Amino acid sequence: MSTTVRPDEVSSILRKQLAGFESEAEVYDVGTVLQVGDGIARVYGLSLVAAGELLEFPNKVMGMALNLEEDNVGCVLFGESNTVKEGDTVRRTNILASVPVGEAMLGRVVTPLGEPIDGKGSIETEIRVPLERRAPGVIFRKSVHEPLQTGLKAIDSMIPIGRGQRELIIGDRQTGKTAVAIDTIINQKGKGVFCIYVAIGLKGSTVAQVVNTLEKYGAMEYTTVISATASDPAPLQFIAPFAGAALGEYFRDTGRHALVVYDDLSKQAVAYRQLSLLLRRPPGREAYPGDVFYLHSRLLERAAKITDDIEVARKMNDLPDALKPLVKGGGSLTALPVIETQAGDVSAYIPTNVISITDGQIFLESNLFNSGQRPAINVGISVSRVGGAAQIKAMKKVAGTLRLDLAQFRELEAFSKFGSDLDKTTKAQLDRGARLVEILKQGQYIPMPVEKQVAIIFLGTQGLLDAVEVPHIRRFEEEFLSMLEHKHPEILKTIAEKGTLEADTAKQLKEAAERFVSSFNQKVKA
């Protein structure tokens, strides 16, 4: 006998099954890979994609939309392009390229997309901000007025840097550009400045060496290293500086001070040129695309000193929603971009672009470096256009004539090579100049506190070192500063606290120096 199903049973079974039915389908905007190669993919579809949006390719390879054309989208790939093939499906993520920001990033080595590569576990941050952001408008800025001490005598005395400034470090390869930047980062210890070191197109071993140096000198606790090495895809080298700027802006907008080093922007320009040519954008001078100036200007304009008025700061343009509740006034972001020149040619395309964007440049020369003057700064063509307003009064007072004295010394030195009979004044000037050059020399990774710099430069410019033989200047400096620290700490303390060199302090310093010079000379002769 066949079992019959009653109609009411059928309806109850259907009801049961329909009750568990999920009607929501996941909707994705997808496209198809038409062509792939050299880290570039052409994708058909994705008609609603935004420029700079992240795209998901198979095998978890991420990409970014750069060229939005009528019939296809030109994407750059952040992973291995050999895992992507023609006909693959590409998904939109509806997320613009962004980077995680926060205190958790300090002490870590990350990729330009914020993924840790130091083996210390994942990074827990609540806030992500877009890589690209418009620079603060004029109304939200304040003029640069606080010093950012580098700890290098030649820079802090003649090419002072202020918080919120953009100062270019330019020179040939192997002239100590990275060393100047690393010394500056080490010198920020205990000064409340958060540092970001962006390595673009450097060797992996060089980045590891930088990280080891920062750890050795205790600088890693307030520093983040963003690494896009030479072996990383060109798109990562292109976005790395923007990731550094975004992280620096987080500290700037929350009322703190940050320093970002871009090492170096020449390699970012090369990576951008590579992407642009592969995307078939028209080439310009030196085959760089027409917007390579805009590439660097929009990056470096993000370094700024923000107004102290918190109400005005809260209205800042392009502020990410996640940052709005945290905004405070008075923060700053200082940028130290690095540019590598070829055979000292500062009139090439990229160097001239960046010189015109920044607020001054520190020019390093290979012949000075090879002659033993380190840091190898050519003070003749190095300038700081806004740093003078940030220099402490004591330094301004003692180093006022330093640049002129050195310029005259260089000129006289060139002429003295032709003639042997020099009058007394010329000889005295040459002797003084040789001593000034000697006191500006400094070892690597030993930045000097500003009060000690003021003391030793005061001795040099006042002629108190004229009695010390040139070969003994470095030893004299070391022993004199050690003596000041132990026997006259009040002199250094007064300079550090007041930021000025009062007449009585100068008198004390002069007397202490005169006594020490005579005892030092006796010791040397003995």
Swiss-Prot record:
It comes from the Bacteria. The record marks 382 as: Required for activity. It is found in: Cell inner membrane. One of its GO terms (cellular component) is plasma membrane. Coiled coil: none annotated. It is a peripheral membrane protein. It catalyses: ATP + H2O + 4 H(+)(in) = ADP + phosphate + 5 H(+)(out). ATP binds at residues 171-178. Keywords: ATP synthesis, ATP-binding, Cell inner membrane, Cell membrane, CF(1), Hydrogen ion transport, Ion transport, Membrane, Nucleotide-binding, Translocase, Transport. It is an enzyme of class 7 (translocase). InterPro entries: ATP_synth_asu-like_sf (IPR023366), ATP_synth_asu_C (IPR000793), ATP_synth_asu_C_sf (IPR038376), ATP_synth_F1_a_nt-bd_dom (IPR033732), ATP_synth_F1_asu (IPR005294), ATPase_a/bsu_AS (IPR020003), ATPase_F1/V1/A1_a/bsu_N (IPR004100), ATPase_F1/V1/A1_a/bsu_N_sf (IPR036121). Its EC number is 7.1.2.2. One of its GO terms (molecular function) is ADP binding. Belongs to the ATPase alpha/beta chains family. Produces ATP from ADP in the presence of a proton gradient across the membrane. The alpha chain is a regulatory subunit. F-type ATPases have 2 components, CF(1) - the catalytic core - and CF(0) - the membrane proton channel. CF(1) has five subunits: alpha(3), beta(3), gamma(1), delta(1), epsilon(1). CF(0) has four main subunits: a, b, b' and c. This is ATP synthase subunit alpha. It comes from Chlorobium limicola (strain DSM 245 / NBRC 103803 / 6330). The lineage of its organism: Bacteria, Pseudomonadati, Chlorobiota, Chlorobiia, Chlorobiales. The gene is atpA.
